[in-house]
Amino acid sequence: DDGRFRAFVNACRHRGVAVEEEERGTKRRFVCPFHSWAYDPQGALVGLPKADHFGEIDKECFGLIELPAEEKYGLLFANPNPSGTVDVDRLLGEDLSKEFEAWNFGAYGRLGGDRYEVDCNWKLAMDTFGETYHFTSLHKDSLANFFEGNVQCYDTYGQHHRMILCKKAIQEMREWPEDRWEITLAGLPVYWIFPNSIVMPSDFGLYVVRAYPDEENPGRHTSVISFYARGESLGTAESNTITTERQALLQTAPLEVLAEVAQGFAAIIRDEDYVASASQQRSAESGAFDHVIFGRNEPALHHYHNTYRAALGMGSLPLLDPTSMN
């Protein structure tokens, strides 16, 4: 193995049965459960029972179908179209590529993850990560204890964007010398990678959320959430209370504890955000009204949907004329 990231169509070249059902792990051989055709980690066909029944089969012609793939900035990118391409720097653009490189995601270690089947369209799931206006209402007993609601810094990067949520700890940090400032102690950066991925570096790790449409039902989707631990410390012992507490957490807490913290954050998404999203879906399906309203304090929502529309060859969302409201 040369250590290079590769991606393949998960289908045996014999009769198309999925070769691997596990989401993650390590194997020297991947064996199809149907007829035991075997492949190595590079996707090459290395064995098949009764090979003589297939004549002079050239194994080099029957490896797993490889997909365009690239590992960059600690993240894995793959194109599901075998004839497509992957150019991460072109996808992200120069400015966002520099930011992702600076995060050093490759040094983070995986804590775990979860998968949710949700009764809402995948775009409604993305919307929940696009504003903090709802924090003091929907999250009044959870995230509102740590974040300022309806406050964010927002920037676009072509099709993508970055929103930084404001933590209440920023009130203490503003009194510190600038050389002790740490962005993830004062805020939570939320990157949206068009069209369906959220990347959130936190003070002790990283959350990645991907929303996949249900091909049979546009009113459902699957959210896959992954958690990662951040290894480096966040300051010096003589710096400040919050930084020192976080250092202690990183240096002494078992990974199981960090995983529980991450799982708790994911549960808020599942039990609060996605419950609201499912309610929105029911309203949309009722036919009672044909549009919703995005406020000026919700710029990410404007960008989400205008970017979707542009990709579909549609015009931008219309601006609301307040004088025409009933």
Language-model features: where?
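Rieske [2Fe-2S] iron-sulfur-binding domain
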Residues: 1-94
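C-terminal catalytic domain of Rieske-type non-heme iron oxygenases
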Residues: 10, 70, 75-326
